[in-house]
Design a protein with these regions (language model features):
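An N-terminal assembly and electron-transfer interface module characteristic of large anaerobic redox
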Residues: 1-273
Length: 273
């Protein structure tokens, strides 16, 4: 760095100032981030505490906001200056014509999402991309249902580079399955994909280009689907049939014909063709 002030963290700034023989106590006071907040790489203050502050900082009226994709991430990404994955997702989403709304908060707070994703009780996002671990799936499920938003997930592979991930026969470590797959799916999160890996050399978390592009495209497609009339949507209905064959329509302890008739009737009543 040309000067200590160019270092990405106050710790490094103080260390470089000390090594240069300067008084590190003359450096600016550290920025204290709120327990929960909203982030965007374009914000001069890095993080704001409320949705209203976020929209004001972005120059957007929340009552007339564009289609919005919220990105849930860990506060540690900011504390460790490892926001490249979140920044990349935000850029891809906004390049697609939507607004990105990255946010973080305590994972054990049963009201955490609603505090950051609503204004006056109304959702300020249309889709959520989750990158957090899921610790309380029942609480998260209730929040997702209350918000009425589809949720997909981008997870990280922390055992090496993108090339090593592609070569791995499993793709996801077994120890990650409970918190990043099983509990996430129980909470209602769908389409869980690996979207980041470690960069060789400095082991910084970076996006896997094709995977991150797929996550952003999925989020943008969900935005389009949300505004498309039901009559224009194409829905496939897949059902269980046992024993296998073309001459029967059955399942254990279930009246499958009646269930299908009820489901198709409900879809038709909702405007699907």
């Amino acid at each position: 760095f040309a000067s200590p002030e160019e270092a990405p963290s106050l710790y490094l700034q103080a260390l470089l100032a000390w090594r240069a023989g300067r008084d590190w106590r003359q450096l600016p006071e550290p920025q204290v981030f709120p327990t929960a907040g909203l982030y965007h790489p374009s914000l001069p203050q890095i993080v704001v505490a409320t949705p209203a502050e976020y929209f004001a900082a972005r120059g957007i009226d929340p009552a007339h906001r564009p289609p919005t994709v919220a990105i849930a991430f860990h506060q540690g990404s900011i504390a460790s200056t490892q926001t490249e994955v979140i920044d990349d997702l935000a850029r891809r989403i906004e390049a697609g014509g939507a607004l990105a709304l990255p946010f973080y908060g305590p994972m054990m707070d049963p009201q955490g999402l609603r505090k950051l994703l609503t204004i006056d009780g109304r959702p300020i996002a249309d889709v959520i991309v989750n990158t957090q671990i899921t610790l309380t799936p029942e609480d998260r499920r209730k929040e997702f249902e209350a918000l009425g938003l589809p949720v997909i997930q981008a997870m990280a592979w922390r055992r090496g580079s993108a090339e090593q991930w592609r070569a791995d026969p499993h793709g996801i470590p077994l120890m990650d399955v409970p918190f990043y797959l099983a509990q996430a799916e129980y909470a209602g999160i769908a389409d869980i994909q690996v979207a980041a890996a470690l960069r060789p050399g400095d082991e910084q978390l970076v996006p896997i280009d094709a995977q991150a592009a797929a996550i952003a495209a999925k989020a943008l497609n969900l935005l389009k689907l949300k505004t498309k009339p039901a009559a224009d949507k194409r829905v496939a209905l897949m059902f269980w049939n046992y024993p296998a064959g073309e001459k029967n329509l059955s399942a254990s302890f279930m009246n499958l014909p009646r269930s299908l008739a009820g489901t198709l009737g409900a879809l038709q009543a909702a405007g699907y063709r």
